[in-house]
């Protein structure tokens, strides 16, 4: 592998951090023709939750302004969809939702769609159990390619809870079809992350090691499926893949044969938790989630990586860090979900420079760039 290939890691070039504008400082949306969007899923990821800052509808409303027209909201729970729509219609974004139609399935919408309702983008926020495979009822992406050729897709992570080989096949089919597709790993869009990436490119550095730590505050997590491995596949899939993706963004592709992992299980003494917000006794013992997972691996270029995910904190705030090591450099990203802070130690000095990005919103930056809406 060339030094350039090693340096780029994920092969994605950096974005100038100065171009990542906070939502409250962005220019007013430019006038233009309607931008039709379909929302799939009427849950927390699409319409917000006290648990965290995710809320895709909010970001697209502010990015597109009066151009946004949500032509369809797809969710089998029509009562939940209706409640979400009513809140929007009672607010300042009425124009985006006043003509929104509700459907239980994407098939229902495709059958009734008029030419005027054809979407330019589809936002997928449904649970991963129902997508990412080629099995009937769990083959959403394949149906989207069939019904909406060429339409841009935004798919929330995780992309699948099925076999990873099948998920890779689905990804190849999306690429072959030519649909622009973005996945909701928004931490790549942090100004701090792009500053790290820019330094690596400008100094022509090669990553030696990455070390990721993701410790969640579990007390506020009250969705039963989250605690059930048979439903949401556990916290590494639900949360830890954010840092797996970020690690790959710097280190590049992983030698899968080198991955080793250990975990603290629910029935081991260190795995006792005192403030679980669901009745775990209703979950089969074999489906209860691990409390701590650690993994190590080698990247294909020879660098090494580690990940620790823990379900251990009370309160609301998570404790998350990513460290990247290079010749002469240590870069430490701290608290990426709240006030992203970057600590940099450079060659020839023991001092750590500190950069805080209190006004950053990677969700908005992602929404702005994934469909080239600038």
Regions found by a protein language model. Give the residues of each.
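NAD(P)-dinucleotide binding in Rossmann-like oxidoreductases
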Residues: 284-290, 300-369, 373
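Short amphipathic alpha-helix with an adjacent loop that forms part of the alpha/beta core around
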Residues: 106-119
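Conserved acidic residues
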Residues: 71, 120, 208
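Rossmann-like dinucleotide-binding domain that binds NAD(P)(H)
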Residues: 224-316
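Short acidic-hydrophobic, aromatic-tinged amphipathic segments that line or gate anion-handling sites
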Residues: 94-108
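N-terminal Rossmann-like dinucleotide-binding module
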Residues: 2-92
